[in-house]
UniProtKB/Swiss-Prot annotation:
SMART domains referenced in this protein's UniProt entry, alphabetically: EFG_C, EFG_IV
Name of the protein described by the UniProt record: Elongation factor G
InterPro entries documented for this protein: EF-G-like_DII, EFG_II, EFG_III, EFG_III/V, EFG_IV, EFG_V, EFG_V-like, G_TR_CS
Keyword rRNA processing: no
Highest rank taxon of the organism: Bacteria
Organism: Beijerinckia indica subsp. indica (strain ATCC 9039 / DSM 1715 / NCIMB 8712)
Length: 691
């Protein structure tokens, strides 16, 4: 069956914003006016169609990006709803990665807020073309022109108004469309579905002409012929002006700014028109790059149905009715349900079973998907976020998504045996859905450790465990992953002898222990010649070594980067055994760690703080107070970026501290960089706490 809409009619876009800017309400209205949602859901009463997880409805924040397909003026819109909280920036990055464009929603009262700055920078990183919708124009204190100024000063964008508001706060009635030079007014009683054109009010004519001139001047810069005509007194007509604005958006030359009030049902239809008129289609964007699996060389996949099939998985969710659902974007070719494909990232075969088009959390089964489609796949076994699925005969790995290392960990203990079983299943599903959430087991205590991007991130995971999976558990305090290291080369000669009547135990080992290169890991080798220690006992020596290295002598943390060499030993025909050599090796390793001068290591994080200039001094002083070493600073747009190396132990609670002294305008990212020796006074505190 041929595709129902040509790829030129596709708009894959996301709606990004600060928490509470009205992003979910805007999406709701888009779905309502484009006919996909029969009742308008309000975030205020926890019923918005897009916010479909309980945790989101309760907190009124959007956590997961739900993908929705709808239609407007014959065009197919695939909308990705992105979260607006700083602990979920991984979700935002993940959705920006597969978008062709974005609508940035601002609160008309607040302007560009801290999370807007973060998301804007992420959109810059992926070169996502965007338009801005200044929302909440009905709110007390709403100021459209201040928001436009904010785009210049806070995120370094070049805003160009294509609409102006008519009135504001309680008197907000409609908009002036500067492209058509008409006023558009909404009729209140029709839930915003009815609106009409009028002439521009007399008191706004002068302002409209001024901003129209700014728009035309910015647009004609993009075309020599249009510029020449304009200088000769001929303005571009509506069709050409739209074409030039579209070009500006595609090249991110300037950012068109629109306005309205989604909650009061004003301005949403012209926003949809702007999405269709100005945001790029899949073929307007650069072809996606990848690596040809067969040759190892870089290749590109064009957004065409005739190219070999390739798609990128960008989100995994556990659906209570369908099971595991993988959201993916088809970049090239076409795919039918029932087809076998290869997961080239993992080199595993997958079969495409059910394919679904998602509308928030309603779903429609489809048989084929084409280049440009965003679909949900049910029943994939091996695929994780960031994996490529492609044609078995033309394998390619598309650009990999990079996910930051988790920086905070907590211990979790199920309260009963039944909870223990449920916990294992639930955690494996949560880890598959979210690559920035990791699960591991503490070797010493046997505790399950959860690792994530921030305190809210882990709070929400624990909440999901309790609500969705009904797991009852105790939660520990956040911890740092320390390590221990041997400092000097030592030679140890150890004998283990035990005689208790009957068969005794006997083993002797002579071993050299020395520091290995940083990050080289632990290593064991045997240089035994002449059978001083028979071959069958050597695994016992290795096992004894590693059992001690898993829990060091200082404070019970894993020992890293040790090389141990077995050079000699002795055995007894009757009394020696694998166990005897294991016990002997354990004793030798403990002695070596004490005599060789073990030290504690701590994780050092590479911290990048982005802050408005006026808070630079406070940020630097605070980092130094956290035992940080500032590596340098530079300007990005109009913000200062400070790079520093800081021990993780001193970074707990940092996000709240940073928010408080920067009024929430500074933000930071951090990732693990290396391990470094803990200063003696700090090491004593750690040992007292853990030993």
């Amino acid at each position: 069956m041929p595709r129902s809409h040509p790829i030129e009619d596709y708009r894959n876009f996301g709606i990004m914003a600060h928490i509470d800017a009205g992003k979910t309400t805007t999406t709701e209205r888009i779905l309502y006016y484009s006919g996909k949602s029969h009742k308008i859901g309000e975030v205020h009463d926890g019923a918005a169609t897009m916010d479909w997880m309980e945790q989101e409805q309760e907190r009124g924040i959007t956590i997961t990006s739900a993908a929705t397909t709808t239609f407007w003026n014959g065009r197919r819109l695939n909308i990705i709803d992105t979260p607006g909280h700083v602990d979920f920036t991984i979700e935002v990055e993940r959705s920006l990665r597969v978008l062709d464009g974005a609508v940035c929603v601002l609160d008309g009262n607040q302007g560009v807020e801290p999370q807007t700055e973060t998301v804007w920078r992420q959109a810059d990183k992926y070169n996502v073309p965007r338009i801005v919708f200044v929302n909440k124009m009905d709110k007390i204190g709403a100021d459209f022109y201040r928001c436009v100024e904010d785009i210049k000063t806070k995120v370094g964008g070049r805003p160009v108004c294509i609409q102006l508001p008519i009135g504001s706060e309680a008197d907000f009635k409609g908009i002036i469309d500067l492209v058509r030079m008409k006023a558009v007014v909404w009729e209140d009683e029709a839930l915003g579905a009815k609106y009409h054109d009028e002439e521009i009010p007399d008191d706004l004519k002068e302002k409209a002409i001024h901003y129209r001139n700014l728009l035309v001047e910015a647009a004609v810069e993009l075309d020599d012929d249009a510029m020449t005509a304009y200088l000769e007194g001929v303005e571009p007509d509506e069709a050409l002006l739209k074409l030039l604005i579209r070009k500006a958006v595609r090249q991110i030359t300037f950012i068109p700014v629109l306005c309205g009030s989604a909650f009061k049902n004003k301005g949403v239809q012209p926003l949809l028109d702007a999405v269709v008129d100005y945001l790029p289609t899949p073929i307007d964007r650069e072809a996606i790059k990848g690596v040809d699996v067969n040759t190892g060389e870089e290749t590109v996949r064009l957004p065409s149905d005739s190219e070999p099939f390739s798609m990128l998985a960008f989100k995994i969710m556990d659906d209570p009715f369908v099971g595991s659902i993988t959201f993916a974007r088809v970049y090239s070719g076409k795919i039918e349900s029932g087809t076998s494909v290869v997961n080239s990232t993992k080199d595993k075969k997958e079969r495409i079973g059910r394919m679904l088009l998602m509308h928030a959390n309603n779903r429609e089964d489809i048989k084929e998907a084409y280049a440009g489609d965003i679909v949900a796949l049910a029943g994939l076994k091996e695929t994780r976020t960031g994996d490529t699925l492609c044609d078995v005969n033309k394998p390619v790995i598309l650009e990999r998504m990079e996910f930051p290392e988790p920086v905070i960990e907590i211990a979790i203990e199920p309260k009963s045996k039944a909870d223990q079983e449920k916990l294992g299943i639930a955690l494996s599903k949560l880890a598959a859905e979210d690559p920035s959430f990791r699960v591991s087991t503490d070797q010493e205590s046997g505790q399950t450790i959860l690792k994530g991007m921030g305190e809210l991130h882990l709070d929400i995971k624990v909440d999901i465990l309790k609500r969705t999976y009904k797991v009852d558990a105790n939660i520990g305090a956040p911890q740092v992953a320390y390590r221990e290291k041997l400092m000097r080369r030592v030679e140890i000669d150890e004998t283990h002898k035990k005689q208790t009547g009957g068969t005794g135990q006997f083993a002797r080992v002579k071993m050299i222990f020395e520091p290995n290169e940083a990050a080289a890991g632990n290593a064991f080798e045997s240089n035994i010649v002449g059978g001083a220690v028979p071959k069958e006992y050597i695994p016992g020596v290795e096992k004894g070594l590693y059992s001690v290295l898993n829990s060091g002598v200082l404070a019970g943390f894993p020992v890293v980067d040790v090389k141990a060499t077995l050079i000699d030993g002795a055995f007894h025909e009757v009394d020696s055994s694998v166990l005897a050599f294991e016990i002997c090796s354990r004793a030798a390793t403990r002695r070596a760690l004490k005599e060789g001068g073990s030290v504690l290591l701590e994780p050092i994080m590479k911290v990048e703080v982005t802050t408005p200039e006026e808070y630079t001094g406070s940020v630097m002083g605070d980092l130094l107070g956290r035992r940080g070493q500032v590596q340098g600073q530079d300007m990005r747009g109009n913000a200062v970026v400070i790079n520093a190396m800081v021990p993780l132990a001193n970074m707990f609670g940092y996000v709240n501290q940073l928010r408080s002294f920067s009024q929430g305008r500074a933000n930071y990212s951090m990732q693990f960089d290396h391990y470094e020796q803990v200063p003696a006074n700090e090491a004593a505190k750690v040992q007292a706490k853990y030993a």
